[in-house]
Amino acid sequence: MAEMILRLRIESKSFSTDRGELPVLGRIDIALGAREIVALVGPSGCGKTTLLRIVGNLDTDFQGALDWCGAAMPRIGTVFQEPRLLPWRTVRQNLLLAQRTEDPELADALLRALDLAAFSDAFPSTLSLGMARRVAIARAFTIDPQLLLLDEPFVSLDPAMAARSRELLLNAWRARPTAALLVTHDRAEAAELADRILLLGERPTQVLQEIIVPQVRRPDLMP
């Protein structure tokens, strides 16, 4: 594994309901390297998105610890299932507004990498779902993230569009490699994108199996 950037140890995580506490996560121990893509694969409702929210510091109500390995919390780029683009801004403006300091050259490079250059002046309402998702991926990269959180970014896309979007995501990642946690139901998708896969069980969720993806499938990870 590359230099580790985070270690997440969860003892338990529950949600409060009218009927009492609902256990969601059991004992989980996840480590992530600086240039590593780790996929979280499991059934609906098993807490995959909750894990991402904990790593993204959006949910701090759990028993356990999130350790950034001696460093400050990194810059995190997040891609949700819904693109959440600003509808009154163009594609390019959505990227520029996300940046800490406007960097038009980086924005344009990402639009090219994700096959969106021809749509830089388009508004989100004119885009297909697949294109809007790619804009969201470009926006996540535009902050120069040290960690990407990808919450089923290709769900509901037709197979051809999903395959093309995965290819373009890897193109962008190879140009700016960073750590990433990917949530997906699709084991084939996980094997294409990740170099480790964590198979999650039913609630209260634990890691059932860790699968190392052969480097021949991910030559970009080879030294």
Language-model segments: residues:
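The feature captures the beta-strand-to-loop junction immediately N-terminal to the Walker
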Residues: 41-43
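Conserved ABC ATPase "signature" region
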Residues: 104-119, 168-171
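Catalytic Walker B motif of ABC-type/P-loop ATPase nucleotide-binding domains
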Residues: 148-152
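Helix N-cap at the start of a conserved alpha-helix in ABC-type nucleotide-binding domains
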Residues: 159-163
